[in-house]
């Protein structure tokens, strides 16, 4: 999945977005280490699975690793980021791992201001109960996974796409689901036009045969539909 990389260190490994990634990487057989600011049940679980997890942040934790995985929340002055740059270690964003999963599967990516986690979870459970053995990456804990992700052997994957920092534009799924678009994450996008343009770009990542399943009740989604030439399947409660 990640050519030439074996030892991977995740900063903030216990966070809601990172824990799903860590679980996938451990199950894929990578030599995983990580760091976080406090002990937790999920950190204990990762240790039981064979990962090395440190409490606190220290430049020594990245010695000998092939790559660092971070989220946008990790500051540039984090000592592990600083050390990785000094040593020329590859620094990946968590979205790069999500992309790597999508690139080798028939990927379904779910985005939107509200309902991403629930929708991703429901699609994942449908595939699990249909014995499709999917790979699932969610931003929250769900009962049927006993966590927030699972590594399947089937050809489907379903992931929660994070539009908050624009990193969802790295993804190239075969199917996109958009629950709604609202004036959210303005700290990153600054204007509603920028947010809408990002969603247009996201839909344009679909291959020609790809489909976008969207809530047709949402005015902003209808705007995206008017801008992008892709196949849309709409759902909603309104008569139109």
Label each residue range with its predicted role.
Residues 130, 233-240:
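Short, intrinsically disordered, charge-balanced linker/junction segments flanking boundaries
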Residues 54, 69, 213:
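Short, conserved beta-strand segments within well-ordered enzyme catalytic domains
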Residues 61-62, 240:
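Short, glycine-/polar-rich solvent-exposed loops and beta-turns at beta-strand/coil boundaries
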Residues 36-38, 140, 217-218, 238:
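Residues in the short beta-alpha loop(s) of Rossmann-like NAD(P)-binding domains
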Residues 1-52, 64, 68, 86-89, ...:
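ATP-dependent carboxylate-amine ligase
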Residues 1-5, 58, 98-100:
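A short, basic/flexible loop-to-alpha-helix module at the beginning of a structural domain
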Residues 53-56, 92:
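Short acidic-hydrophobic, aromatic-tinged amphipathic segments that line or gate anion-handling sites
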Residues 24-30, 47, 61, 72-231:
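Phosphate-binding loop of NTP-binding sites
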